[in-house]
Regions:
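Translation machinery proteins
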Residues: 1-12
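NTP-dependent small-molecule kinase module
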Residues: 13-23, 29, 91-97, 116, ...
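Generic surface-pattern signal
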Residues: 1-2, 33, 37, 54, ...
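ATP-dependent NMP and nucleoside kinases share a basic, alpha-helical "lid"
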Residues: 20-29, 36-97
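Short, surface-exposed, polar/charged, turn-prone segments marking secondary-structure boundaries
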Residues: 39-42, 63, 86-89, 104-108, ...
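Small-molecule kinase domains that catalyze NTP-dependent phosphoryl transfer to phosphate-bearing small molecules
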Residues: 4-6, 49-55, 63, 68, ...
Length: 161
C-alpha cells in the first residue's frame, strides 16, 4: 500500500494499482467498517498514517485520527452533521462519481457504519476530549472551511504567545 499526494489529492496504490477512486465507492463504504474492526488491519493503517505525518504539517480526516493516530495533534476538529445532511452529501458525492445510490440506502449505510465504528474495540469512533466540535449540518463548505481556519488561527496564536 502506497499513499501519495498528487495535485492536492491523496492517491492510493495497492500492489502498483491505483485504487483511489474505488476506495471511495459505495461498495467499499458498505464494507469498510467490518474490515476496520480487524485489529491487525488497524495497526497497519495507523502506522502508515503516522508515517505520512511524521514531519508535521499534515491535515488528516478519519474516525480515529485525533484519538489514536495523532492524539497529540496541535489542532483537533471533530466534524458532525445530522444523518439526513450526511446522507444527502454522500449520495451527491457518489452521483458526481458516476454512481447513483438512493438516499435511504446511503443513510442506512451511514447509521450502520456509525454503530460499528463507535462500538469496535480497536480505534473506536469517539470525540477526543480536547477536540473542537464543529456541527456542519447547516453550513456551506466555504463556511465550514472558515470555521475551521478560525480555530486553527486561535490555536496558532496561543502557541506563539
Amino acid at each position: 500500500i502506497v499513499l501519495s499526494f498528487i495535485d492536492g489529492e491523496t492517491n492510493i496504490t495497492v500492489n502498483g494499482e491505483d485504487v483511489s477512486k474505488e476506495i471511495r465507492s459505495f461498495e467499499v463504504n458498505s464494507n469498510v467498517s467490518e474490515i476496520s474492526c480487524i485489529e491487525g488491519v488497524r495497526k497497519i493503517l495507523v502506522k502508515k498514517q503516522q508515517e505520512m505525518g511524521k514531519n508535521g504539517g499534515v491535515v488528516m480526516e478519519g474516525r480515529d485520527i485525533t484519538t489514536v493516530v495523532y492524539p497529540n495533534a496541535d489542532v483537533k476538529i471533530f466534524l458532525t452533521a445530522g444523518i439526513d445532511e450526511r446522507a444527502e452529501r454522500r449520495a451527491k458525492e457518489f452521483s458526481e462519481k458516476g454512481t447513483d445510490v438512493p438516499i435511504d440506502k446511503v443513510k442506512e449505510n451511514l447509521k450502520n457504519r456509525d454503530f460499528i465504528d463507535s462500538n469496535r474495540e480497536a480505534s473506536p469512533l469517539k470525540k477526543a476530549p480536547d477536540s473542537i466540535e464543529v456541527d456542519t449540518s447547516n453550513t456551506t463548505i466555504e463556511e465550514q472551511v472558515k470555521l475551521i481556519l478560525d480555530q486553527v488561527k486561535i490555536i496558532a496564536d496561543k502557541k506563539r504567545n
